[in-house]
Amino acid sequence: MNRLQLYFRLIRLHKPIGILLLLWPTLWALWMASDGKPDWTLVAIFTLGTVLMRSAGCAVNDYADRDFDKHVQRTVDRPITSGKIKPYEALLVALVLTLLAFALIWPLNTLTKQLSIAAVIIAATYPYFKRFFAIPQAYLGIAFGFGIPMGFAAVQNTVPAAAWWLLVANVFWSVAYDTEYAMVDREDDLKLGMKTSAITFGRYDVAIIMFCYAMTLGIIGIVGWQFGLRIWFVAGLLLAAVCAAYHYTLIRSRERAGCFAAFNHNNWLGGAIFGGVALDYLLR
């Protein structure tokens, strides 16, 4: 494997699910903030920025977890922990990607740039929250959802209360899907003393995941209704609810394969919500 391929693996370009989980909430925000008529330049900036910042986050995460990944079956072959990439290289990659992302938003208003600094700090500190915070997935939800206030800021030069409520909804969604992800590694994380929601929730994990899905859809539903979204939006939410119900069938036995499949399937849940939002605006 050549150097470029190793860097691609470091930043998970071969696993786009993480990009999509960041992108969908950002697109919800851009469409709602612009009344369904987003500036396509903004859409391009935020889409590329999502790819860059998710990639930078992966590099920072692998740097932070390099001494733990070697003890986890799923992560033992990651480039840093396997010795194929030096730790300092990962930090350099993260720095370059972050600077590129910041260059993208440089033409935007001051508020968006200020929020981007907060977003970088949150993304960079997330890997360390797993050492002491009982539910780091909630912090991840803030990191993965910070495109929401940034999107509103870029369009409206302000961040209304609705944007923060969408961020809260994204936190619930993140706790749901990343708990599914954490259930895959639960036994390894217990041995390492790592903190995850899958460990914290214990035997109530499945019930709490479903509660978080319900809160996600409920909050988004209320926010969307306030924005005047109606039939197609509701249809999108119902389709997302069907996705969540399907996840229950995958995770109720707590088998690794099913939990991982449910995590990956969240792309469809986020896409269903966006489809409902976009169609409702388009077909008015």
From Swiss-Prot:
Q: What is its EC number?
A: 2.5.1.39
- One GO biological process from the UniProt record? ubiquinone biosynthetic process
What topology in the membrane does the UniProt record assign? Multi-pass membrane protein
What UniProt keywords apply to this chain's record, in alphabetical order?
A: Cell inner membrane, Cell membrane, Magnesium, Membrane, Transferase, Transmembrane, Transmembrane helix, Ubiquinone biosynthesis
Subcellular location(s) of the protein: Cell inner membrane
Cofactor(s) for this UniProt protein: Mg(2+)
Look up the record and name the pathway of this protein: Cofactor biosynthesis; ubiquinone biosynthesis
State the Gene Ontology terms under molecular function.
4-hydroxybenzoate polyprenyltransferase activity
Q: Which gene encodes it?
A: ubiA
Q: Where are the transmembrane segments?
A: 16-36, 40-60, 91-111, 132-152, 157-177, 207-227, 231-251, 259-279
Q: Which InterPro entries does this UniProt record tie to the protein?
A: HB_polyprenyltransferase-like, Prenyltransferase, UbiA_prenyltransferase, UbiA_prenylTrfase_CS, UbiA_sf
Q: Which family does it belong to?
A: Belongs to the UbiA prenyltransferase family.
- Write down the chemical reaction(s) this protein catalyses: all-trans-octaprenyl diphosphate + 4-hydroxybenzoate = 4-hydroxy-3-(all-trans-octaprenyl)benzoate + diphosphate
Any one Pfam family match given in the protein's UniProt record, by short name: UbiA
List the record's Gene Ontology CC terms alphabetically. plasma membrane
This protein's name: 4-hydroxybenzoate octaprenyltransferase
Role description: Catalyzes the prenylation of para-hydroxybenzoate (PHB) with an all-trans polyprenyl group. Mediates the second step in the final reaction sequence of ubiquinone-8 (UQ-8) biosynthesis, which is the condensation of the polyisoprenoid side chain with PHB, generating the first membrane-bound Q intermediate 3-octaprenyl-4-hydroxybenzoate.
The organism of origin for this protein: Janthinobacterium sp. (strain Marseille)
